Amino acid sequence: MKIFLRNHNQVGNGLEEYFDIVGFDEAEKIVLWQDVMGEERGLAKLAHALKKPVIQIQHGRRGYTQYRYPFNKEMLSDKFCIWGKTDKDNLIEAGIPEDKLVITGTTVFRHLKPKIKHKGKNIVFSPDHWDYDIQENDKVVDVLRKLKGVNITTKVMEEHDIRKYDNPVFSNRNRPNHLEVCAEVLRKADLVVAISEGTFELMAQILNIPVVIANLFTPRPCNGDHRYLKFKLSFSEAVKKEPEIKNLAKVIRQQLKNPDELREQRRSAALNDGGIEIKDPLQRIVEVIKTTTI
Protein backbone atom coordinates (compact mmCIF):
# COMPACT_ATOMS: atom_id res chain seq x y z
CA MET A 1 0.00 0.00 0.00
CA LYS A 2 1.21 3.50 -0.85
CA ILE A 3 0.88 6.22 1.78
CA PHE A 4 1.82 9.88 2.08
CA LEU A 5 3.40 10.52 5.49
CA ARG A 6 3.91 13.77 7.37
CA ASN A 7 6.03 12.76 10.35
CA HIS A 8 6.72 14.84 13.48
CA ASN A 9 8.25 13.90 16.81
CA GLN A 10 9.19 10.60 15.16
CA VAL A 11 5.70 9.14 15.68
CA GLY A 12 5.61 7.73 12.15
CA ASN A 13 8.94 5.97 12.40
CA GLY A 14 8.75 2.33 11.33
CA LEU A 15 5.86 2.74 8.89
CA GLU A 16 8.33 2.50 6.02
CA GLU A 17 8.68 -1.20 6.90
CA TYR A 18 5.00 -1.80 6.07
CA PHE A 19 4.13 0.76 3.39
CA ASP A 20 5.60 2.50 0.38
CA ILE A 21 6.09 6.15 1.39
CA VAL A 22 5.28 8.22 -1.70
CA GLY A 23 4.19 11.70 -2.76
CA PHE A 24 0.69 13.02 -2.10
CA ASP A 25 -0.62 12.48 -5.64
CA GLU A 26 0.50 8.85 -5.80
CA ALA A 27 -0.64 7.91 -2.29
CA GLU A 28 -3.72 5.82 -1.57
CA LYS A 29 -3.96 7.11 2.00
CA ILE A 30 -2.74 10.22 3.82
CA VAL A 31 -1.07 9.93 7.24
CA LEU A 32 -0.59 13.15 9.22
CA TRP A 33 0.57 14.20 12.69
CA GLN A 34 -2.19 16.83 13.02
CA ASP A 35 -5.15 18.14 11.03
CA VAL A 36 -5.95 21.42 12.76
CA MET A 37 -3.60 24.05 11.33
CA GLY A 38 -1.29 25.09 8.53
CA GLU A 39 -0.32 22.89 5.63
CA GLU A 40 -1.48 19.69 7.33
CA ARG A 41 -5.05 20.95 7.58
CA GLY A 42 -4.95 21.88 3.90
CA LEU A 43 -3.65 18.43 3.03
CA ALA A 44 -6.49 16.80 4.99
CA LYS A 45 -9.08 18.86 3.10
CA LEU A 46 -7.50 18.09 -0.25
CA ALA A 47 -7.32 14.39 0.58
CA HIS A 48 -11.03 14.26 1.23
CA ALA A 49 -11.76 16.15 -1.98
CA LEU A 50 -9.83 13.40 -3.76
CA LYS A 51 -11.57 10.65 -1.75
CA LYS A 52 -8.39 9.64 0.06
CA PRO A 53 -8.67 8.50 3.70
CA VAL A 54 -6.85 10.59 6.32
CA ILE A 55 -5.26 8.94 9.36
CA GLN A 56 -3.80 11.04 12.15
CA ILE A 57 -1.11 9.78 14.53
CA GLN A 58 -0.99 11.59 17.88
CA HIS A 59 2.35 13.36 18.06
CA GLY A 60 2.50 14.50 21.68
CA ARG A 61 0.85 14.42 25.08
CA ARG A 62 -2.74 15.68 25.28
CA GLY A 63 -3.55 15.32 21.62
CA TYR A 64 -7.05 16.57 22.34
CA THR A 65 -6.16 20.20 23.13
CA GLN A 66 -7.05 21.80 19.79
CA TYR A 67 -10.43 20.06 19.67
CA ARG A 68 -11.49 21.43 23.05
CA TYR A 69 -12.29 24.90 24.34
CA PRO A 70 -11.22 27.55 23.50
CA PHE A 71 -10.18 26.24 20.06
CA ASN A 72 -12.99 23.79 19.24
CA LYS A 73 -11.38 22.70 15.97
CA GLU A 74 -13.14 20.25 13.68
CA MET A 75 -11.45 16.87 13.31
CA LEU A 76 -10.93 16.15 9.62
CA SER A 77 -9.17 12.82 10.12
CA ASP A 78 -11.15 9.67 9.42
CA LYS A 79 -9.23 7.88 12.18
CA PHE A 80 -7.08 9.19 15.00
CA CYS A 81 -4.46 6.89 16.54
CA ILE A 82 -4.31 8.05 20.16
CA TRP A 83 -2.10 7.17 23.09
CA GLY A 84 -4.45 6.27 25.92
CA LYS A 85 -7.62 6.64 27.96
CA THR A 86 -7.03 10.28 28.91
CA ASP A 87 -7.00 11.33 25.27
CA LYS A 88 -10.06 9.28 24.38
CA ASP A 89 -12.12 10.61 27.28
CA ASN A 90 -11.26 14.22 26.46
CA LEU A 91 -11.90 13.85 22.75
CA ILE A 92 -15.30 12.27 23.34
CA GLU A 93 -16.11 15.08 25.76
CA ALA A 94 -15.14 17.52 22.99
CA GLY A 95 -17.74 15.94 20.72
CA ILE A 96 -15.46 13.82 18.54
CA PRO A 97 -17.27 10.65 17.38
CA GLU A 98 -15.95 7.64 19.25
CA ASP A 99 -15.70 5.58 16.07
CA LYS A 100 -12.94 7.91 14.85
CA LEU A 101 -10.75 7.16 17.87
CA VAL A 102 -8.44 4.16 18.19
CA ILE A 103 -6.21 3.69 21.23
CA THR A 104 -2.99 2.39 19.72
CA GLY A 105 -0.41 3.61 22.20
CA THR A 106 2.69 5.25 20.75
CA THR A 107 6.19 4.33 19.65
CA VAL A 108 7.57 7.45 21.38
CA PHE A 109 8.41 5.65 24.61
CA ARG A 110 10.32 2.79 23.04
CA HIS A 111 13.21 5.28 22.85
CA LEU A 112 13.48 5.39 26.65
CA LYS A 113 16.56 3.86 28.25
CA PRO A 114 17.15 2.45 31.75
CA LYS A 115 18.41 4.94 34.30
CA ILE A 116 22.07 4.71 35.24
CA LYS A 117 23.86 5.35 38.51
CA HIS A 118 25.56 8.71 38.89
CA LYS A 119 27.12 10.98 41.47
CA GLY A 120 25.32 13.96 42.95
CA LYS A 121 21.78 15.22 42.34
CA ASN A 122 20.89 16.00 38.76
CA ILE A 123 18.05 18.37 37.88
CA VAL A 124 16.84 18.75 34.30
CA PHE A 125 15.02 21.97 33.42
CA SER A 126 12.55 21.68 30.55
CA PRO A 127 11.78 25.27 29.44
CA ASP A 128 8.32 25.88 28.08
CA HIS A 129 8.01 26.11 24.30
CA TRP A 130 5.74 28.71 22.72
CA ASP A 131 6.17 30.69 19.51
CA TYR A 132 9.01 32.44 21.33
CA ASP A 133 11.14 31.88 24.43
CA ILE A 134 8.77 33.08 27.18
CA GLN A 135 9.78 35.14 30.21
CA GLU A 136 8.60 32.54 32.70
CA ASN A 137 11.56 30.40 31.65
CA ASP A 138 13.94 33.15 32.81
CA LYS A 139 12.40 33.17 36.29
CA VAL A 140 13.01 29.45 36.71
CA VAL A 141 16.59 29.78 35.47
CA ASP A 142 17.25 32.38 38.19
CA VAL A 143 15.99 30.02 40.90
CA LEU A 144 17.94 27.03 39.64
CA ARG A 145 21.18 28.99 39.45
CA LYS A 146 20.94 29.77 43.16
CA LEU A 147 20.47 26.14 44.19
CA LYS A 148 23.57 24.70 45.82
CA GLY A 149 24.74 21.10 45.71
CA VAL A 150 22.91 20.13 42.52
CA ASN A 151 23.81 19.76 38.85
CA ILE A 152 21.61 21.57 36.32
CA THR A 153 21.04 20.49 32.72
CA THR A 154 18.61 22.26 30.41
CA LYS A 155 16.75 20.35 27.69
CA VAL A 156 16.17 22.97 24.98
CA MET A 157 14.42 22.83 21.61
CA GLU A 158 14.25 24.89 18.44
CA GLU A 159 12.23 27.75 20.02
CA HIS A 160 14.72 28.44 22.78
CA ASP A 161 17.62 30.88 22.96
CA ILE A 162 20.31 28.37 23.88
CA ARG A 163 22.61 31.14 25.19
CA LYS A 164 20.31 31.80 28.16
CA TYR A 165 20.49 28.34 29.69
CA ASP A 166 22.94 26.37 31.79
CA ASN A 167 24.39 23.17 30.31
CA PRO A 168 21.94 23.12 27.39
CA VAL A 169 21.24 19.91 25.52
CA PHE A 170 19.54 20.61 22.18
CA SER A 171 17.19 18.58 20.04
CA ASN A 172 14.76 19.43 17.26
CA ARG A 173 11.41 17.64 17.04
CA ASN A 174 11.70 17.46 13.26
CA ARG A 175 15.03 15.63 13.35
CA PRO A 176 15.40 11.85 13.66
CA ASN A 177 17.47 11.93 16.87
CA HIS A 178 15.09 14.07 18.95
CA LEU A 179 13.67 11.34 21.17
CA GLU A 180 17.05 9.68 21.57
CA VAL A 181 18.45 12.96 22.92
CA CYS A 182 15.52 13.30 25.35
CA ALA A 183 15.97 9.72 26.54
CA GLU A 184 19.69 10.17 27.08
CA VAL A 185 19.18 13.31 29.20
CA LEU A 186 16.71 11.48 31.44
CA ARG A 187 19.03 8.53 32.12
CA LYS A 188 20.86 10.49 34.83
CA ALA A 189 18.01 12.74 35.98
CA ASP A 190 16.85 12.79 39.61
CA LEU A 191 14.18 15.44 39.04
CA VAL A 192 12.63 17.44 36.19
CA VAL A 193 11.53 21.06 36.56
CA ALA A 194 9.09 22.43 33.99
CA ILE A 195 6.40 25.05 33.44
CA SER A 196 3.99 22.82 31.54
CA GLU A 197 3.51 19.05 31.55
CA GLY A 198 4.16 17.70 28.09
CA THR A 199 5.69 14.71 26.36
CA PHE A 200 9.15 15.14 27.90
CA GLU A 201 7.62 15.26 31.37
CA LEU A 202 5.61 12.11 30.61
CA MET A 203 8.82 10.37 29.57
CA ALA A 204 10.24 11.32 32.98
CA GLN A 205 7.14 10.03 34.77
CA ILE A 206 7.35 6.70 32.98
CA LEU A 207 10.89 6.41 34.37
CA ASN A 208 9.53 7.32 37.83
CA ILE A 209 11.38 10.65 37.90
CA PRO A 210 9.67 13.35 40.02
CA VAL A 211 8.40 16.39 38.11
CA VAL A 212 8.06 19.82 39.71
CA ILE A 213 5.96 22.41 37.91
CA ALA A 214 6.69 26.12 38.28
CA ASN A 215 3.05 27.06 37.76
CA LEU A 216 3.80 30.53 36.45
CA PHE A 217 2.36 30.44 32.95
CA THR A 218 0.47 33.54 31.83
CA PRO A 219 -1.92 33.05 28.88
CA ARG A 220 -0.83 34.87 25.73
CA PRO A 221 -1.45 34.63 21.96
CA CYS A 222 0.50 32.00 20.04
CA ASN A 223 1.32 32.49 16.36
CA GLY A 224 -1.24 35.29 16.27
CA ASP A 225 -4.07 33.14 17.68
CA HIS A 226 -5.75 35.12 20.46
CA ARG A 227 -7.85 32.17 21.59
CA TYR A 228 -4.79 31.17 23.61
CA LEU A 229 -5.65 34.02 25.97
CA LYS A 230 -8.44 31.75 27.26
CA PHE A 231 -6.32 28.60 27.25
CA LYS A 232 -5.46 26.94 30.56
CA LEU A 233 -2.68 24.42 30.99
CA SER A 234 -3.72 20.93 32.06
CA PHE A 235 -1.86 18.95 34.70
CA SER A 236 -2.03 15.39 35.96
CA GLU A 237 -1.82 14.45 39.62
CA ALA A 238 1.71 13.17 38.97
CA VAL A 239 3.35 16.58 39.36
CA LYS A 240 4.11 18.86 42.29
CA LYS A 241 2.88 22.35 41.36
CA GLU A 242 4.17 25.57 42.89
CA PRO A 243 2.62 28.89 41.76
CA GLU A 244 4.96 31.12 43.79
CA ILE A 245 8.45 31.51 42.37
CA LYS A 246 9.80 32.33 45.83
CA ASN A 247 8.79 28.83 47.02
CA LEU A 248 10.09 26.89 44.02
CA ALA A 249 13.50 26.02 45.50
CA LYS A 250 11.85 24.66 48.64
CA VAL A 251 9.54 22.39 46.64
CA ILE A 252 12.46 21.13 44.55
CA ARG A 253 14.39 20.25 47.70
CA GLN A 254 11.35 18.52 49.17
CA GLN A 255 10.88 16.34 46.08
CA LEU A 256 14.56 15.45 45.94
CA LYS A 257 14.31 14.21 49.52
CA ASN A 258 11.01 12.40 48.94
CA PRO A 259 11.19 11.05 45.38
CA ASP A 260 8.57 8.34 45.93
CA GLU A 261 5.82 10.67 47.16
CA LEU A 262 3.99 10.65 43.80
CA ARG A 263 5.17 7.25 42.56
CA GLU A 264 1.65 5.84 42.13
CA GLN A 265 0.42 9.00 40.41
CA ARG A 266 3.30 8.77 37.96
CA ARG A 267 2.38 5.16 37.25
CA SER A 268 -1.21 6.22 36.60
CA ALA A 269 -0.09 8.95 34.20
CA ALA A 270 2.11 6.46 32.36
CA LEU A 271 -0.85 4.14 31.86
CA ASN A 272 -3.65 6.62 31.16
CA ASP A 273 -1.75 9.35 29.32
CA GLY A 274 0.96 7.24 27.70
CA GLY A 275 -0.72 3.87 27.17
CA ILE A 276 2.53 2.17 28.07
CA GLU A 277 0.83 -1.16 28.78
CA ILE A 278 -0.09 -1.50 25.10
CA LYS A 279 2.06 -4.02 23.31
CA ASP A 280 3.39 -3.29 19.81
CA PRO A 281 1.79 0.12 19.16
CA LEU A 282 3.39 0.28 15.71
CA GLN A 283 1.50 -2.83 14.63
CA ARG A 284 -1.75 -1.30 15.91
CA ILE A 285 -1.09 1.90 13.96
CA VAL A 286 -0.32 -0.12 10.84
CA GLU A 287 -3.62 -1.96 11.18
CA VAL A 288 -5.55 1.31 11.50
CA ILE A 289 -3.93 2.64 8.33
CA LYS A 290 -4.65 -0.57 6.41
CA THR A 291 -8.31 -0.74 7.41
CA THR A 292 -9.38 2.92 7.28
CA THR A 293 -11.76 3.82 4.47
CA ILE A 294 -13.63 6.98 3.56
Residue ranges and their predicted role:
Residues 275-294:
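C-terminal alpha-helical cap of glycosyltransferases
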Residues 39-40, 65, 87-91, 111-112, ...:
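Short, charged/polar "capping" segments at the starts of alpha-helices
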